[in-house]
Every structure is written in structure tokens, then in C-alpha cells.
A protein has these predicted regions:
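C-terminal catalytic lobe of FAD-dependent flavoproteins
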Residues: 97, 140, 230, 234, ...
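Short beta-strand to alpha-helix junction loop
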Residues: 41-51, 76-85, 124-146, 153, ...
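Short loop/edge segments at beta-strand edges and connector loops
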Residues: 17, 70, 104-106, 154-156, ...
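Flavin-dependent oxidoreductases
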Residues: 161-167, 171-250, 254-263, 274, ...
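Helical element adjacent to the flavin cofactor pocket in flavoenzyme catalytic cores
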Residues: 124-181, 189
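Dinucleotide-binding Rossmann-like beta1-alpha1 core, especially the glycine-rich loop
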Residues: 32-112, 121, 236-237
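Glycine-rich FAD pyrophosphate-binding loop
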Residues: 7-29
Length: 401
């Protein structure tokens, strides 16, 4: 997101990516939720970026052609004793600027979601919550940045920094790179890079979240994203539809030491199934087609760290970007790009490319249009993946960009 919004300005920009492609870390292993913004502490940078990112997402989805749906969310309250917590969540959301929030009673809740537990007494309804495809969002941002001149260097791990004469030398496993400014967006490793240069140290704990993904025949089990009342470790285990028609269940919240620890555990999966089953009834967990785990970059103060690092001029942090990081990413990208504009005196490009064409999905076409597409491009008639009906044409489109 930072690269995409920075690409609006003149200048040479390079993304150093440790993995073989974009969207290989936390960006690919998360809940795929666009949060409304009622949970983050009022007055925090996290709350500000959450709301702004939520408001930006619909237009961004149109501009960059990725899947997004404003399906709304429900935070379910399971006891009368917890109603004050639900009310506090509502009031926090109102202070944060979230529109259309409403506390609904059990009758209205079960009209909205028949599969929610019969023991539920109320819920916080946020119609502005949504779901998104995190893979295509990330890829779309990267492709649009590339179209606007941003360079990418993959399989390149940063190992250190040297500051001299107003420039940073970035040391990597593929040689050195020199830049006036460094933007640190290294996820669970952001504190490691920050602590190499800053006098004020950060500490990030990898927080593992296990998930189950259910088959598409469960896609109408719930229509809203169903949350539990949030606790110290996050927003609890959710049950949500996905933009692809599946149901996703998760995550757990387990603090670990391993920054690459994305293995699932039987204990973690059993825990999330039990917790999800307390919120919804008859969860079709036997329809699970895969399980996975992702890591959240939990900063000790549970706050986004965005700005110039203390004692390290021209080194800009984007650290501690845990949930609602996906939702906040467009706002963070815009915020950092404007910060860089002011610091460097950047000029806007005369011909910025604001849109991007997504990979065509033939399943969205009418029968007649699909037949016409096959006549024009026969590769779209060759099914490579029969389960998901992925065609050769889609694969060729994706790899020839």
C-alpha cells in the first residue's frame, strides 16, 4: 500500500521483499475482514487508520478490481452480565466515528442470523463492516505500484544498515542498496530492523492465529461476520463468509517466539472449533477443506508505530501493524506517502495510473459471454483445476503481468 500511494509522486522507489513474491506473510494468512472500526481504542492511531481504511476500501476495490463486499458484522453478546461491555463497545465506535452502529436485541439478531446461538441476548450490528480478498488486494496494490514505476527485488533479505552522508546503505543477501529514505514495513520483523538503527527500542511478539476454511457449500451458513466480545488478546474467534463463497473460522491468539511459526496445532484448532461453537449453532466444521495459521505483529503497547524512528533520521517505521492492519493498509499507505511528500518535497506525477485490471474470472460471465470468450481465447475453455474451475486463460493472465 505504501508503494502504491508513493508511486503517485516523481522519484525512484524500490521494494525489497524477503519472499519470492508479495503476499507471502501475514498478508495472505488472516481473517480477510474489513473492520468497521468500533474496537480500536478511541484517540489511537490504530482507530484513525482503521476508520479511514474502511472508508477508502470500496473505491479502492473499484479502482484496482479486487473482490470486496460490505456484508456487515455482528458482535454477539452471550449473557445479560456482558451487556455493559457491548454498550461500551458501541460507545467507543460512535466516538471513533463509525456510522450506522446499532445494538440489536435477540429477536432482531436471530432474524439477521438464524444460526447464531439461541443463548445470545444481543449484538452490536455494524453495517459498514466488510470482507475482502487479501491476496488480490495485496497483488493489486503491487501491480499498480509497478505500473507506476516502482521496482521490486524479490528473495532479498535485509541484514543491516549503514548511515553515511545523508544516505542509508541497506545490506542484503543480494548486495547493498543505497537510498535517501528507508520505509520499514517488515511485519513481525519490523522491530528487528528498527532496533538496528533506533535509540528507542521496539518489541514485537508474533501472535499465531489458527484458522479453518470450510467448503463453498457452507457459504450461506452466515451472511455477516460474527464476532465474539473482544478480550485482551483480540477480537475472539469469528465465523464469516468469504468473498469466494467459503466460510472461515478463527483465529486463535497464541503468543510464540518463532517469527516463522505458522504451523497449526491440534490444540489450537480444537480450541477455535469449541469457541466458535459457542457463538453459532450447528457449525458445519466437518466441511473443513484446509486449516492454516498466520502471525500478527503484536507491539507491546498494542498500537501502530508509524513515523520517523527516534535517533534514526530518514528511517520511517510502519511497525506493529496487527489487526486491523489489513483494513488500515490503504490509509497507512496514504499517510506515509504524504509524510514522504512533505519530507522530500516530492512532486505529483502528471500521468499517474490510478486503476488496474484484475484477472478475469469466467465464472462471473453469462453463458453467452463465456462462450464468446472461449471462441476468442480458447485457453479459457481449458479447465486446469476442476475443484475451483480455474482455466488456463486465468493462469496465463496472472503470470504474464
Amino acid at each position: 500500500a505504501v508503494a502504491r500511494y508513493l508511486s503517485r509522486y516523481e522519484g525512484r522507489m524500490l521494494v525489497l521483499e524477503k519472499a519470492e513474491d508479495v503476499c507471502c506473510g501475514t498478508s495472505k494468512a488472516n481473517s480477510a475482514i474489513v473492520h468497521a472500526g468500533f474496537d480500536a481504542a478511541h484517540g489511537s492511531l490504530m482507530a484513525k487508520m482503521n476508520l479511514e481504511g474502511n472508508l477508502m476500501m470500496p473505491q479502492l476495490a473499484k479502482d484496482l478490481d479486487f473482490a470486496f463486499k460490505m456484508n456487515g458484522s455482528l458482535v454477539v453478546c452471550m449473557s445479560e452480565e456482558d451487556l455493559p461491555k457491548l454498550r461500551a463497545l458501541y460507545e467507543n465506535g460512535v466516538k471513533n466515528g463509525v456510522k450506522e452502529l446499532e445494538i440489536v436485541d435477540a429477536k432482531r439478531l436471530h432474524e439477521l442470523e438464524p444460526n447464531v446461538s439461541k443463548h445470545a441476548v444481543a449484538a452490536l450490528w455494524a453495517p459498514t463492516g466488510g470482507i475482502v480478498c487479501p491476496f488480490n488486494l495485496t497483488i493489486a496494490l503491487a501491480e499498480n505500484a509497478f505500473d507506476n514505476g516502482v521496482e521490486f527485488q524479490f528473495n532479498t533479505e535485509v541484514t543491516g544498515f549503514t548511515w553515511e552522508d545523508g544516505f542509508w546503505t541497506i545490506h542484503t543477501n543480494h548486495g547493498d542498496f543505497e537510498s535517501r529514505y528507508v520505509i520499514n514495513a517488515a511485519g513481525v520483523y519490523a522491530d528487528v530492523l528498527h532496533n538496528m538503527v533506533s535509540t528507542r527500542k521496539l518489541h514485537i511478539t508474533p501472535r499465531r492465529g489458527d484458522y479453518c476454511l470450510l467448503d463453498k457449500n457452507t457459504g450461506d451458513f452466515v451472511s455477516h461476520t460474527i464476532f465474539q466480545l473482544p478480550g485482551k488478546l483480540g477480537k475472539g474467534v469469528l465465523v464469516s463468509p468469504t468473498v469466494h463463497g467459503n466460510t472461515i473460522v478463527g483465529p486463535t491468539a497464541i503468543d510464540i517466539d518463532d517469527r516463522e511459526g505458522t504451523n497449526t496445532t491440534a490444540e489450537g484448532l480444537n480450541d477455535l472449533i469449541e469457541k466458535a461453537g459457542a457463538t453459532v449453532e450447528h457449525l458445519p466444521i466437518r466441511q473443513t477443506i484446509t486449516s492454516f495459521a498466520g502471525l500478527r505483529a503484536h507491539e507491546d503497547h498494542h498500537e501502530f508505530v508509524i513515523g520517523e524512528a527516534e535517533g534514526a533520521q530518514q528511517f520511517i517505521d510502519c511497525a506493529g501493524i496487527e489487526s486491523p492492519g489489513l483494513t488500515s493498509s490503504p490509509a497507512i499507505g496514504l499517510h506515509v506517502s504524504e509524510l514522504m511528500r512533505d519530507l522530500m518535497g516530492l512532486r505529483e506525477k502528471a500521468h499517474f495510473i490510478a486503476t488496474r485490471r484484475g484477472v478475469l474470472d469466467p465464472k462471473t460471465l453469462s453463458k453467452e459471454d463465456y462462450q464468446q470468450l472461449i471462441r476468442e481465447k480458447p485457453a479459457y475453455g481449458q479447465i486446469i483445476c476442476r475443484c475451483e474451475q480455474v482455466t488456463e486463460g486465468e493462469i496465463l493472465d496472472a503470470i504474464r503481468r
